Curated annotation (Swiss-Prot):
One biological process term in Gene Ontology: protein refolding
UniProt source species: Chlorobium luteolum (strain DSM 273 / BCRC 81028 / 2530) (Pelodictyon luteolum)
Cofactor, free-text remark: Binds 2 Zn(2+) ions per monomer.
Protein name, UniProt field: Chaperone protein DnaJ
Subunit structure as annotated in this protein's UniProt entry: Homodimer.
Location(s), subcellular: Cytoplasm
Database matches in NCBIfam families: DnaJ_bact, PRK10767.1, PRK14281.1
């Protein structure tokens, strides 16, 4: 099973392009085949890093991945763009430009990263249970969630008066650097400023309500638009709907994990559904029409004369809407024979008379005989 691309690069879901590129450079250098000859594990990691970067560095692919996971980008990540030995289509100039960040000389090093306005909020994960009917058509759900919200007393600034001052340690950069000489040249270590936590500014007159954090626990209502065809384990990402960041930091994302409620009538198979129908022996022999429940209401189904037990009958277009593209799956009705446990004496006499008829005797079993239910299901669904 593929790992989450954000996990592969070691970044949060709210990471910007610069953070993603920086993480990619570091990992690509670590696992590059030139540095790890004849190392299959490193080669696999290198491929995985390139695949993750190709998706997360592309706005459209990242949007689809955030909404639908690996299913949203299909196999494009593994086969796109580059066409080289390791696939992916990543820009390898990103790897080699990283040397300017690590060693002195050359172009004089990378530009100083400016501190962000506050610390980004933490992503929030919730679980949303859906019925099969909701999944079949898609649904808009209004839900209440508890999360970190901006403090009303200080408007999220963390300061009682709203005043802040430039950090005296990093002078507003949000980071500190320490240079050291090695056999490869000058090595520069970059870390978040320990004084301001990477914000570049320090709060004055801390708010007594939020203790200077700028955020408090609250409850909000959000709307989630769920497309048709989602499956258990899929997730939707609502950008900026997660926890608010401390002291005006950008909010994190709300990750909605999809759960599918068990259905009392139907079993799901991809975008198709299966319904089991019990039919009397006379109706199987003579044929009949019956009302069959579907996800959209009851429909008439014809049971042909001579239908065998465990036959699968198809009702086109009564399954689940496709996640990508138009159309729906189908509903399959598995026909089983109903065997009553209690009979009147008259019923028993009729069955005894019927049993004497040679026309209802079962055919001799042979290698080419009737297929089992599992064989029929395999033929239908692959």
């Amino acid at each position: 099973m593929k790992r989450d691309y954000y996990e592969v690069l070691g970044v949060s879901r709210s990471a910007d392009k610069d953070e993603i590129k920086k993480a990619y450079r570091k990992l690509a250098l670590k696992y590059h085949p030139d540095k790890n000859p004849d190392n299959k594990d490193a080669e696999d990691h290198f491929k995985e890093v390139n695949e993750a970067y190709e998706v997360l560095s592309n706005d459209d692919k990242r949007r689809r991945y955030d909404q639908f996971g690996h299913a949203g980008v299909g196999s494009s990540a593994a086969s796109g763009g580059g066409g080289g030995q390791y696939g992916g289509g990543a820009d390898f100039s990103d790897i080699f430009s990283a040397f300017n960040d690590m060693f002195g000389g050359g172009g004089g090093g990378s530009q100083r990263r400016r501190a962000a306005s506050g610390i980004p909020g933490v992503d929030l994960k919730i679980r949303l249970k859906l019925t099969l009917e909701e999944i079949a058509k898609g649904v808009e759900k209004t839900i209440k969630i508890k999360k970190q919200v901006p403090c009303k007393e200080c408007n999220g600034s963390g300061s009682k008066t709203g005043a802040t001052e430039t950090c005296p340690t990093c002078h507003g950069a949000g980071e500190v650097r320490q240079a050291s000489k090695t056999m490869f040249g000058q090595f520069v270590n970059i870390a978040a400023c320990p004084t301001c936590g990477g914000e570049g500014r320090i709060v004055k007159d801390r708010c007594p309500s939020c203790y200077g954090e700028g955020i408090k626990q609250g409850e909000v209502t959000v709307k989630v638009n769920v497309p048709a065809g989602v499956q258990e384990g899929n997730y939707l990402t609502l950008r900026g709907q997660g926890n608010s960041g401390p002291r005006g930091g950008a909010p994190g994302d709300l990750i909605v994990m999809i759960e599918e409620k068990p259905h009392e009538l139907f079993v799901r198979n991809g975008d198709d559904v299966i319904y089991s129908l019990a039919v009397s022996f006379p109706d199987l022999v003579l044929g009949t029409k019956v009302d069959v429940p579907t996800l959209e209401g009851a429909v008439k189904l014809t049971i042909p004369a001579g239908t065998q037990p465990e036959t699968m009958l198809r009702i086109p277009g009564h399954g689940i809407g496709h996640l990508r593209g138009s159309g729906k799956g189908d509903q399959y009705v598995r026909v089983n024979v109903y065997v009553p446990k209690e009979l009147t004496q008259q019923d028993k006499d009729l069955l005894r008379d019927l049993r004497k008829s040679p026309s209802i005797a079962p055919e001799a079993h042979s290698a080419g005989g009737a297929k089992s239910f599992f064989e029929k299901a395999r033929d239908i669904f692959g």
